[in-house]
Amino acid sequence: MELDRDKKTFAYFWLFGLINNILYVVILSAASDIIGPSLPKSIVLLFDIMPSFLIKLSAPFFVHSIHYDKRIPILILLSMLGIILVSTRSLWLCLPGIVLASLSSGFGEITFLQLTHFFGSKSLTGWSSGTGGAGIVGSFSYLLLTTVFRLNIQLSLLLYAALPLIFLLYYKINDSIVSSQVYQSLDMPIDSSDGPIELLKSNGWVDIVKRLSKLVIPYMIPLSTVYLFEYLINQGVAPTLLFPIDTTPFVKYRDIYVTYGTLYQLGVFISRTWGHKLPVKNLYLFSVLQLINLLITLSQSYYYWTDSISWIMVLIFYEGLIGGSSYVNCFMNILKDVDPNEREFVLGSVSISDSLGTLIAAFLGIILEPSLCKHQIGTGRPWCRME
């Protein structure tokens, strides 16, 4: 019986993680199609991460006033409207659409990470695996639709618009899982809790800031730096990791960029699903390893020391493994080490870290990618300006 509950918990949170992150991934995969080859891909990353970062930054001060039941319709509406606007392919409609999808992704991550406090490690494993699955499903499905099946970009994007309705499965949790005494019930109004939410309301903003400051060194800095380095690679360097098209298995240069994204997401999925089986306490290890990956890719982009795309594809896959491992180990450490009365607050608050690192990478990438591309053109490698 308990095994069945664990399986259901994992399955539900796997789906929540998948749907919450899939539009974010699809939008990044479509970056070259949304803005074309002449503009930095980090512009899309900036619009895809800034709203998510802002809502995560402000959430500790207001999220306790919104019941979980009321959050789900908000997530669905934002996601569906966002991807519909993005599918228009008009830059001035795409960018607001990306903002709406980003708000949904950030608010969804806070919501479901906080819910793992009630459901335990199986829910966190399911969530982490699902978010990793969103990477591979999102990037691979977009690659399949646009590169293999050659569907037009607008139709390909519209096909994702119905997926947020899967969030409605949340309302089945009470019947299929929470009714068991193994789990804490979520039936009571969230603002009547005697736990961390009530503490938030009574202690005020100053106390919240003090509690947040205790999370910076053990959790926030290592997770932020991992995401900083990997998204500098993905959006700032990877668009310039190109080779003569006739030496690759691809038809267009944009196919190389989309394939890099798929390989990265495959690595993320594998490590987010099974990374908890190799627990790592010192999260700074992942920061160092990801920094090494960034330096290697920068040197390839600038000096072109290998003419084999295979080595770069392997490196991008490995980069995904490191990123996914960092994420799952960070939140697993929180579940194991943080006092239960603080855990819900900590899980929601630390989620800002990945967005912070990604946001900084977006700003840096706007400068980095054009600089690398300019250098490549000057040395006889004009591929970064080709489609």
Swiss-Prot record:
<protein>
    <recommendedName>
        <fullName>Protein BTN1</fullName>
    </recommendedName>
</protein>
<feature type="transmembrane region" description="Helical">
    <location>
        <begin position="347"/>
        <end position="367"/>
    </location>
</feature>
<dbReference type="GO" id="GO:0006865">
    <property type="term" value="P:amino acid transport"/>
</dbReference>
<keyword id="KW-0813">Transport</keyword>
<feature type="transmembrane region" description="Helical">
    <location>
        <begin position="257"/>
        <end position="276"/>
    </location>
</feature>
<dbReference type="GO" id="GO:0005774">
    <property type="term" value="C:vacuolar membrane"/>
</dbReference>
<keyword id="KW-0812">Transmembrane</keyword>
<feature type="transmembrane region" description="Helical">
    <location>
        <begin position="43"/>
        <end position="63"/>
    </location>
</feature>
<feature type="transmembrane region" description="Helical">
    <location>
        <begin position="225"/>
        <end position="245"/>
    </location>
</feature>
<comment type="similarity">
    <text>Belongs to the battenin family.</text>
</comment>
<keyword id="KW-0029">Amino-acid transport</keyword>
<comment type="function">
    <text>Involved in vacuolar transport and vacuole pH homeostasis. Also required for cytokinesis.</text>
</comment>
<feature type="transmembrane region" description="Helical">
    <location>
        <begin position="129"/>
        <end position="149"/>
    </location>
</feature>
<feature type="transmembrane region" description="Helical">
    <location>
        <begin position="278"/>
        <end position="298"/>
    </location>
</feature>
<feature type="signal peptide">
    <location>
        <begin position="1"/>
        <end position="31"/>
    </location>
</feature>
<keyword id="KW-0926">Vacuole</keyword>
<feature type="transmembrane region" description="Helical">
    <location>
        <begin position="72"/>
        <end position="92"/>
    </location>
</feature>
<dbReference type="InterPro" id="IPR003492">
    <property type="entry name" value="Battenin_disease_Cln3"/>
</dbReference>
<keyword id="KW-1133">Transmembrane helix</keyword>
<dbReference type="GO" id="GO:0051453">
    <property type="term" value="P:regulation of intracellular pH"/>
</dbReference>
<feature type="transmembrane region" description="Helical">
    <location>
        <begin position="151"/>
        <end position="171"/>
    </location>
</feature>
<feature type="transmembrane region" description="Helical">
    <location>
        <begin position="308"/>
        <end position="328"/>
    </location>
</feature>
<keyword id="KW-0732">Signal</keyword>
<feature type="transmembrane region" description="Helical">
    <location>
        <begin position="93"/>
        <end position="113"/>
    </location>
</feature>
<dbReference type="Pfam" id="PF02487">
    <property type="entry name" value="CLN3"/>
</dbReference>
<dbReference type="InterPro" id="IPR036259">
    <property type="entry name" value="MFS_trans_sf"/>
</dbReference>
<keyword id="KW-0472">Membrane</keyword>
<dbReference type="InterPro" id="IPR018460">
    <property type="entry name" value="Battenin_disease_Cln3_subgr"/>
</dbReference>
